[in-house]
Amino acid sequence: MSHVTRFISLLVALLMLCLSAAFAENSGSITVVDVLDREVTLPVDVEKVVITFNFEEYFAVTGAAGVDKLVGYSHAYWEGRREDAWTTYTTAYPQLLDIADVGYNDNINVEAIIALKPDVVLMSAPVNYTFMETQFDKFDAAGIPVVFFNFHAQTLEMHRASMELIGKVMGDEARGSEIADYYEEQMNLVYDRVASMQEDAGKPSVYMEFSMGPSQYGNTWSTRMWGALIGQCGGRNIAADLGDANSVEIAPEQIIAENPDIIIFTASPRNDVSDNVVLGYGADAEAARAALRSYETRTGWDSLNAIQNGKLSGIYHDLSRHIFDFAGTQFLAKQIHPELFEDVDPEANLADFFAKYMPVELDGVWTITLED
């Protein structure tokens, strides 16, 4: 093939690419690649949305305008698991109460979603993909695109990809990228300082537990969720060898034997538990601190390093696996290595994020220590 022929072939290829892009734009559709490397074609102007998880990330991109674009969502995730967030959003936007419930997890109502005729369905890959593997043909037949994001991976790269993806889908790529940049800057406050630690600086031992009240031992985390974050923040998780499940049980005797340097409870409102630590929207600092102190009375805990040194704290459970979870990571890092993060104020940074990007006001208490 001559140089001239090759040049002409290249020009033809470029022309076809430009024509293809122009056709897609003129036809009112775009193609995105989701976090599962699936190419998905959807309308340029999305007006009707169904979402099953990570509502805050959607609203961070759309603002209040996103409420009117919702035609269906999973009520059980919000109303059933995160009562404080549910109350906050439905108080600010009562119309959310009238939007269709499309089910949750393995009980997603595919027929109900199809009947709503959304322009796009937004789903969490780790939460919804296994169920959806047998349902794609129904959505394809109805011409309804499904896009997957992933905030469960707890990596900077996947958070960024997911946030930028939502921005593209909702027609505001610039905002999605801006939020991703903000997140990266906040996370690097932790990553850079932990990376600068001397190898012989030591890793304090950490125990984390889902607060269920002092009389009941909640689950802990091994290699996932909070367990993974302990390592990222320069700590040693005493439950690291207990398996790879989402959460794991630990014997009370093992906690005492491990004698952790730091104990952190994750907390959220639960209607079925009256004496747990309550943090999040609308939470009260003094009530949360009193509940936190009640854990000091557990049998054998008076001998633990964490209790003797006042290293007992609490954090809102959903300051993980969200685009605002940088505040949770910063708080965790500050508890583990206070000397490295003395100038970092996680709740102030969280408040700044909400003021910039969220369509509801930040109130309540999201982290708590004994010293405040």
What are these regions (language model features)?
Residues 1-11:
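Bacterial N-terminal signal peptides that target proteins for export
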Residues 6, 19-59, 174-209, 341-372:
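Bacterial Sec-exported substrate-binding components of ABC uptake systems
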Residues 12-20:
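Hydrophobic core
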Residues 35-37, 96-109, 243-252:
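Short helix-initiation/N-cap motifs at beta->coil->alpha
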Residues 57-115, 120, 124-127:
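A short, structured surface patch at a secondary-structure boundary
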Residues 75-83, 125-134, 149-163, 198-228:
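Extracytoplasmic ligand-binding site segments that recognize negatively charged/polar headgroups
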Residues 100-101, 154-168, 177, 181, ...:
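Structured C-terminal subdomain patch of bacterial secreted/periplasmic proteins
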Residues 219-246:
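Alpha-helical, coiled-coil/dimerization segments enriched in small aliphatic residues
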